[in-house]
Amino acid sequence: MATITREEIKEAIKSMTVLELAQLVKDLEEEFGVSAAAMVAAAPAAGGAAGAAAPAEEKTEFDVILTNAGANKINVIKVVREITGLGLKEAKDLVDGAPKPVKEGVSKDEAEQIKKKLEEAGATVEVK
């Protein structure tokens, strides 16, 4: 039996249609007694379909997004520097480039605290 490299397998898969890929998945599931659905659930950050299923679970990581600096931009820059540890130029660029994430992947409590600080400084903020 000839040995096929992983690269050759990847190239063959790239050339397949969606229907052929679906049939290949079914064949592999039957051959090895596994389920592709279990693999998708184990890696929710892998793609768009897995990301669509995630909202059913309670969210544990949040992104704090500065949508508008408001009229008191200097105070907002100071708060952004305090929260992120960025330098003056980087913090100013972040504030000037709004809407931009200030902090990503934080707990709900931390996200709410950051939002409160930024809003007290005059910024418009949303937590996603």
UniProtKB/Swiss-Prot annotation:
Superkingdom as given in the UniProt entry: Bacteria
A molecular function (GO) term: mRNA binding
SUPFAM superfamilies given in the database record: ClpS-like (SSF54736), Ribosomal protein L7/12, oligomerisation (N-terminal) domain (SSF48300)
Pfam families xrefs: Ribosomal_L12 (PF00542), Ribosomal_L12_N (PF16320)
GO biological process, one term: translation
Keywords: Ribonucleoprotein, Ribosomal protein
GO CC terms: cytosolic large ribosomal subunit
Protein family (similarity comment): Belongs to the bacterial ribosomal protein bL12 family.
Subunit details: Homodimer. Part of the ribosomal stalk of the 50S ribosomal subunit. Forms a multimeric L10(L12)X complex, where L10 forms an elongated spine to which 2 to 4 L12 dimers bind in a sequential fashion. Binds GTP-bound translation factors.
Function, in words: Forms part of the ribosomal stalk which helps the ribosome interact with GTP-bound translation factors. Is thus essential for accurate translation.
Official protein name in the record: Large ribosomal subunit protein bL12
